Amino acid sequence: MLKIGVRLPRRFEDSGDYLADARAVESAGADSLWLDGEGYDPWLLLAGVATITGRIRLVAPVSSADLGAPHDLGAKLATLSRLSRGRVVLTVGGAANGAAPVAAALELARGHRCHVLLEAASDRRAGLADGVVGLGESPERFRAAVEPIARFREREKLAGAFECWATIKMPDDRETWRRLRQEYEQAGATGLIVPADPRLLDLLRNGDDEEDRSDLGLAQG
């Protein structure tokens, strides 16, 4: 089954509402919580979310600067991993992609038993990580980007689980939601990342139900 990740903003007015949104997303069945690129410190935000959730995975962004200070990064990862009871996933940004940064992130992550996903990774060596994020702007482009990585993993006999995440806009309705999930899953995606939206909770809970159009029937007599 396709996993669903929800991308939360990194800015908010009321911390109580923000944490309540995170709990609601977990209750609705989402696999993971992701964060926008700009705003408050992501590690502090995820630490707060970790204390009020119990199942959902917490995706922490890792930058080139983070990898340049491995001791500090290790301390942050150890803290968040302990608070979340092992629910942390690391994403390495596009600017940090490359053999050395990826190897450093993987070594650090293995010590804390967490996965590493590469963002916007087009290099087949991305197959050495645990997954990739943000490939392509359509199911067709997604498939074209994933296939070389899949062939690399097959050639290198890398048989472990590998996650392929696509980022989409908030669907307009349930029919679009069903169609996008089907198309991306057929293209090789294992997960979709969707921006937080009040309508998303209903899609997560009832996305496979037919929309009630009885009001149209009544209006038409």
What is each residue range found by the language model?
Residues 1-221:
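Active-site-adjacent structural elements that line small-molecule/cofactor binding pockets in enzymes
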